[in-house]
Amino acid sequence: MKISANSIRTGNILVYNNDLWVVSKTPEHTQPGKGGAYVQVEMKNLKTGTKRNERFSSSDYLEKAELEQKDYQFLYFEGDDLVLMDTKHFEQINVPKEILEEKLPFLTENMIVKVEFYNEKPLNIELPPTVILEINETDPVIKGATATASYKPAILENGIKVKVPQYLEVGEKIVVKTDDMTYVERAK
């Protein structure tokens, strides 16, 4: 499917120079005083892992990879692979851990994830937008901290460090965004 350079978004997988590239950073749209508008795109090759910056004219069209998306349940780790089970047909597949990169700590047992396939090969795993995690370490509560909008560092059960409001304590569960690893709210 062809898309305009202006329509490129973070996470899009493009077919460029006969390779698959994932857009790794929000594209910058620039309108210089002289010359035509262009879009600066940072992307990563899915095969080699190399990063590249490309400049496309706003009038350019690029090929967006047609991906098939299926729901899978995470079962367990097996060496350097994740073992996932299709939620409809109960078939199990092994997917390399490196597909998730820095989001791997958010993966919990029995979590439902979306696996994106290109030509029947798993390319990407999409986690739920938020997860509930427990605070393992943080500074003690300071009296009167509910009135301030300041944050303190906290280490969660999965080892991730996030900034949380001053009033939260060790043992409390919080909601965290998986895309940028930020605090959302106290879990209900």
UniProtKB/Swiss-Prot annotation:
GO MF: translation elongation factor activity
Q: Does the keyword Metal-binding apply?
A: no
Its pathway, per UniProt, is: Protein biosynthesis; polypeptide chain elongation
Taking the first listed entry, what is the main subcellular location of this protein, grouped into a coarse class?
A: cytoplasm
Q: What does this protein do?
A: Involved in peptide bond synthesis. Stimulates efficient translation and peptide-bond synthesis on native or reconstituted 70S ribosomes in vitro. Probably functions indirectly by altering the affinity of the ribosome for aminoacyl-tRNA, thus increasing their reactivity as acceptors for peptidyl transferase.
Family that this chain belongs to: Belongs to the elongation factor P family.
What name is this protein filed under? Elongation factor P
Its source organism is Rickettsia felis (strain ATCC VR-1525 / URRWXCal2) (Rickettsia azadi)
